[in-house]
Amino acid sequence: MFKEFREFALKGNVVDLAIGVIIGAAFGRIIDSLVNDIIMPFFGALGGLDFSNYFFPLTKGVTASSLAEARRQGAVLAWGNFLTVAVNFLIIAFVLFLIVRSINTFRKRVLKENLEVTPPAKPQDVVVLEEIRDLIAARRA
């Protein structure tokens, strides 16, 4: 059983998937930093807003002005944090769209070049018929 698991785990697809997940997690952290440390503060400076502390208290006991303190006091609806995460998602989705689009364009270009370079081979029956035709034409001449 261990041997079967080892063979499964070391297949190319499983290893490729694991590498993709690790790279994806690292990419997610980069995007989080981009949104939290660059994009959202920029919008905050323009409008004087800090989205990270925007929330609606869901209980009457919540009187704090920061999200961390409000969460300690009771239930809150942290819509500012949700907005930040939604922006993260949109950026990741857009970057992935650009990557997939460029890969598809590259594949189409390579496929088109390969089709232009190598003409399709004639089927064997057509080749045999052409040989027969040529032999008949040679006998008549």
UniProtKB/Swiss-Prot annotation:
The chain crosses the membrane at residues 8-28, 38-58, 80-100. Homopentamer. GO terms for molecular function: mechanosensitive monoatomic ion channel activity. InterPro entries: Mechanosensitive_channel_CS, MS_channel, MSC/AndL, MscL_channel. This is Large-conductance mechanosensitive channel. Its main location: membrane. It comes from Beijerinckia indica subsp. indica (strain ATCC 9039 / DSM 1715 / NCIMB 8712). It is found in: Cell inner membrane. It is a multi-pass membrane protein. Keywords: Cell inner membrane, Cell membrane, Ion channel, Ion transport, Membrane, Transmembrane, Transmembrane helix, Transport. The keyword Ubl conjugation does not apply. The gene is mscL. One of its GO terms (cellular component) is plasma membrane. The lineage of its organism: Bacteria, Pseudomonadati, Pseudomonadota, Alphaproteobacteria, Hyphomicrobiales. Channel that opens in response to stretch forces in the membrane lipid bilayer. May participate in the regulation of osmotic pressure changes within the cell. Belongs to the MscL family. Pfam families: MscL.
